[in-house]
Every structure is written in structure tokens, then in C-alpha cells.
């Protein structure tokens, strides 16, 4: 499956992943007039009602990096998290950056990407394609990804379809 799935150690125990094809940051989406608007650091977000889908790197990011004063609101899927934001039951939701841009541009009128968070740790979060363990197609896909990377085509695709990422302000992790 190619569907914005982040490569994690826990997931890698159950499935095989292709090599990473896109470095992704987490982002926060809220209404332009919400308590989250204008946030420049995680300290500005810690007192807010934040939500994310269960089992996602977005939820992990809230608990591990933002460390809000109250437990995050956890939803079964992104549709429920978006509905909670739309109903203003939460101040903001955390999503991966491409999803955040789509939500704010297409799905929930009046929202904006408040900001994106910088990469943390030794390696960036990456999207990878998911395969059943032992599937021989994974090696073929990895070869194709390597060729796309080497030719510059992967970068060109990112610039054409995901170049908005440069427009999202960075929210500092240090208070």
C-alpha cells in the first residue's frame, strides 16, 4: 500500500516497508482565530485541547514532544479527529504535513496550518510503502525508488505536488 504510512519500528515488526520515499514533518491545524493561531513554540500549545488519530505518529508527537497539560483527545480515525476540530471540540489537531495542507485547503473551511514541527531525533520520519512480510515486490520497488532518487525525479515530484511545505512556519520545540 502507498498511503502516507510512516515507517516505525513497531509497524516494521508486522509488515515489510519499502525504503522511505518522503521525509515528513508533523503539523498542527486549527481555525485561524483559535487559541492555537499564532503559536511559535510548543509552550504556546501545551495548554490547548489537542487531538489526533490513535496509533499514529501524530499522537506520539503530541505526547512525546508537545507534552500538553491535559491528555490529548484520541480518535479512531482522522475523519473523527477532523469532525472534532470542525465542531471546535478541540483547539487543534496534529497531522502529517501533507494531510494538514489538504485538511486546511479542502476539508475544513476557515482552518489553517498553524505550523510544522522540525525533525526530531537522528533520522527524519519517512513514508514507506507497505508489503506483506517476505513479499519479493519490495525489492523491485526499492530499486525503482533508488532510480527515481538518483535521476532527480523523486525531488521533482515532491516540488510539483508538495512544494507548499515551505509556506508552513516552523514551531520551535524548545519552550
Kindly label every feature range from the protein language model:
Residues 37-38, 73-87:
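Short helix-initiation/N-cap motifs at beta->coil->alpha
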Residues 1-44, 119:
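Acidic, polar ligand-binding/catalytic clefts
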Residues 33-41, 73, 134-139:
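Short helix-loop capping/hinge motifs at secondary-structure junctions, enriched
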Residues 23-30, 105-143, 164-175:
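Periplasmic-binding protein-like
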Residues 41-56, 71:
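Short loop->beta-strand "edge-of-pocket" segments that line small-molecule binding or catalytic clefts
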Residues 45, 84-86, 129, 141:
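Hydrophobic residues within well-ordered alpha-helices
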Residues 3-14, 63-64, 91-123:
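A ligand-binding cleft/hinge motif common to bilobed small-molecule-binding domains
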Residues 57-72, 112-114, 143-175:
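Ligand-binding clefts/hinges and TM-proximal coupling segments of bilobed small-molecule sensing domains
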